[in-house]
């Protein structure tokens, strides 16, 4: 347990120290976040807020992994590689947005293709390394999938989780707060299941986000960008996969799921009827339109995530 605490503290320290160094540089380089014109009007004041904060995640994770290398194994390295690979996709997307000076990076097809390629490589390695067993929450049984079905499911899973976390990153501190709770849950589970090295990696991610939240909470001084949100999605997906608990992400990451479903429902219903189900999607914007302040949305979504984590614990008992 002491090693996990060290991993949290080390990554927290390097994360929080990089803020004052990194944010002014991004300002000077004019690496500001373009704001979607059809979004909430009160978000327009955020235009120009530095983005690509996910670079802090990458540098801190690398430093922490090196420092904690004696307490890590191939499972932890696998989770890091997944995090890093998806963060690189996000970095490309963020770079293009800044280059174009608009909220337009990779096209949906380009981003989807890159995610498919990375996920396919991950799925093949995961099958070879971990097999195709998947734990079913509440039923407490293990389901063994045929190789092709397993690898296809893993591809879908990674693409879904990374995009879900990306969609959740729409309010100051929202994705950071929710993901801290989700990864803390997996820290406890991995430790209790004797996956000590993986729990150290989880601790690194938690520490990074705790430090970053100092600058990302309302009013945000920096955004994590796609570099951070897609990278975090890769980390969450990988951690759960190593534990053979990908289905549990549906529960602990319930906010991610709701964000995606609200977007799908909104688009599908509008195409069919020309009307909207929500005032705006993803659903965090719907609550803003109802008059909720950003901080209230983040607080309520975090509380919901705590409850979902408790339910998830019950599914494993």
Curated annotation (Swiss-Prot):
Pathway: Cell wall biogenesis; peptidoglycan biosynthesis. Its EC number is 2.7.8.13. Its cofactor is Mg(2+). Disulfide bonds: none annotated. It comes from the Bacteria. PROSITE patterns: MRAY_1 (PS01347), MRAY_2 (PS01348). Keywords: Cell cycle, Cell division, Cell membrane, Cell shape, Cell wall biogenesis/degradation, Magnesium, Membrane, Metal-binding, Peptidoglycan synthesis, Transferase, Transmembrane, Transmembrane helix. It catalyses: UDP-N-acetyl-alpha-D-muramoyl-L-alanyl-gamma-D-glutamyl-meso-2,6-diaminopimeloyl-D-alanyl-D-alanine + di-trans,octa-cis-undecaprenyl phosphate = di-trans,octa-cis-undecaprenyl diphospho-N-acetyl-alpha-D-muramoyl-L-alanyl-D-glutamyl-meso-2,6-diaminopimeloyl-D-alanyl-D-alanine + UMP. Its main location: membrane. GO terms for cellular component: plasma membrane. It is found in: Cell membrane. One of its GO terms (molecular function) is UDP-N-acetylmuramoyl-L-alanyl-D-glutamyl-meso-2,6-diaminopimelyl-D-alanyl-D-alanine:undecaprenyl-phosphate transferase activity. The chain crosses the membrane at residues 3-23, 48-68, 72-92, 112-132, 141-161, 171-191, 193-213, 238-258, 297-317. CDD domains: GT_MraY. It is a multi-pass membrane protein. GO terms for biological process: cell division; cell wall organization; peptidoglycan biosynthetic process; regulation of cell shape. InterPro entries: Glycosyl_transferase_4, PNAcMuramoyl-5peptid_Trfase, PNAcMuramoyl-5peptid_Trfase_CS. The keyword tRNA processing does not apply. Belongs to the glycosyltransferase 4 family. MraY subfamily. Catalyzes the initial step of the lipid cycle reactions in the biosynthesis of the cell wall peptidoglycan: transfers peptidoglycan precursor phospho-MurNAc-pentapeptide from UDP-MurNAc-pentapeptide onto the lipid carrier undecaprenyl phosphate, yielding undecaprenyl-pyrophosphoryl-MurNAc-pentapeptide, known as lipid I. This is Phospho-N-acetylmuramoyl-pentapeptide-transferase. It comes from Clostridium acetobutylicum (strain ATCC 824 / DSM 792 / JCM 1419 / IAM 19013 / LMG 5710 / NBRC 13948 / NRRL B-527 / VKM B-1787 / 2291 / W).
